[in-house]
Regions:
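Catalytic core of DAGKc-family lipid kinases
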Residues: 45, 52, 92-208
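Hydrophobic packing residues within well-ordered alpha-helices of enzyme cores
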Residues: 38, 60, 86, 110-111, ...
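Internal helical hairpin/lid segments
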Residues: 207-221
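Conserved acidic residues
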Residues: 3, 72, 204
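ATP/NTP phosphate-donor binding region
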Residues: 10-77
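Short glycine-/acidic-enriched loop or helix-start segments at secondary-structure transitions
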Residues: 31, 85-87, 111-112, 217-218
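Conserved small/polar residues in nucleotide/adenosyl-binding loops
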Residues: 1-9, 219-220
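Short Gly/Thr/Asp-enriched flexible loops that form oxyanion-binding sites at enzyme active sites
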Residues: 82-93
């Protein structure tokens, strides 16, 4: 009967190990208000959950490289940068593990492009579900990006804008930092190859994006 089906599903799910990586400071630390409910949802979905809070830039990458192979699924929560770090770790370790994303940053443009709910519990429900889909990613040197890679004007804004300002002002914090860079605008001589075509010119800005909208959270080319 139906009860036996649920029992069998539960037995299968209990063998699944999940690594939950999140940035505790992203988006005004809103993850803290939902953490218990999110973990409870993961456990009820049949996962044995390990929680890790990122402590510094690239910490999520290091965690995935060192321990990712021991898990059946990885879920991350934070801004677009946190997701980039997790994907970089998966690529460096050559792991093929399903990942889930619970957006909690100041912009979350990439999540919006994928139609991931803004409400954290709804996003968590999708992250532990069984509906999977492939997603394009970009790579250069040893870095991987799922959102955007860019060079030139304003590309340092994301790194120079403090987490405290982002939590207080959101998008406006990026604008405030960007205005400071208008005094010094360098250009770059570039050769671009695409679809069998080549062109060269001087550029003050360039980007490759995987999103339908762009704020200012960059990976540097």
């Amino acid at each position: 009967g139906l009860g036996d089906v649920y029992k069998r599903q539960g037995e299968l799910r209990m063998s699944q190990k999940l690594l939950f990586i999140f940035n505790p400071h992203a988006g005004k630390g809103q993850i803290k208000n939902h953490l218990v409910d999110i973990v409870d949802m993961m456990v009820k979905a049949g996962f044995d959950v390990t929680i890790y809070t990122t402590q510094a830039q690239a910490d999520a990458t290091r965690k995935v490289v060192e321990e990712g192979a021991g898990y059946d699924r990885i879920v991350c929560s934070g801004g677009d940068g946190t997701l980039d770090e997790v994907m970089t770790g998966l690529m460096q370790a050559k792991l093929h593990i399903p990942i889930g994303y619970i957006p909690a940053g100041s912009t979350n443009d990439f999540a919006n492009s994928l139609g991931i709910p803004k409400e954290m519990l709804k996003a968590a429900e999708r992250a532990v579900g069984q509906n999977r889909f492939p997603c394009d990613i970009g790579d250069f040197n040893s870095d991987t990006f799922v959102y955007i890679a860019a060079f030139g004007l304003f590309t340092e804004v994301s790194y120079k804008t403090s987490q405290q300002l982002k939590n207080i002002f959101g998008h406006v914090a990026y604008i405030m930092e960007g205005v400071k860079q208008l005094r010094d605008i360098p250009s770059f001589r570039m050769q671009v190859e695409y679809d069998g075509k080549v062109f060269q010119d001087e550029f003050i800005y360039g980007m490759v994006t995987n999103s339908v909208s762009v704020a200012v959270s960059y990976t540097h080319l």
